[in-house]
Amino acid sequence: HEKLVFIDGEMKELQNYPPLIEANVLSIMVAHIAVKNNTTYNTDGMPATTSRRIVTDLLRDSLNFNGLIVTDALNMGGVRNVPEAEVLAVQAGCDIVLMPLDADKAYDRLLEKYTTDEQFKIEVDNSVKRIIRAKLALGLMNEE
């Protein structure tokens, strides 16, 4: 929790995910772990939370996960020194960002990006749809 840790090479832990996804797990939390020496999913020294290769290419596209993708706490050591980590996490494909160092600044950066970047706006709008679907599935909202 205090520093960025690395997976070196093959990601053996991935074998646990397909059965969970097939069982319709509603959400997956992405950890602040970097991947190195992996030609497909190398995160270039950045936490997986901020990596489109991990969040979108792997979880969404390769593993066909359609539920919510949530960051681990953004105030943790493995990611707290990454500038605009909350924006990078959303750009990577995360739907929900947890515990940024400064929630007000994070909100301002996310709002600025949302209002000035059409692709980012599309990502956020898709995340909102997934969040609403999850709430409906859990009976937390009416369909009205």
Where do the protein language model's features map onto the residues?
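Mid-to-C-terminal alpha-helical segments outside catalytic/metal-binding sites
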Residues: T115-E143
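Second-shell residues forming the walls of enzyme active-site clefts
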Residues: H1-E123
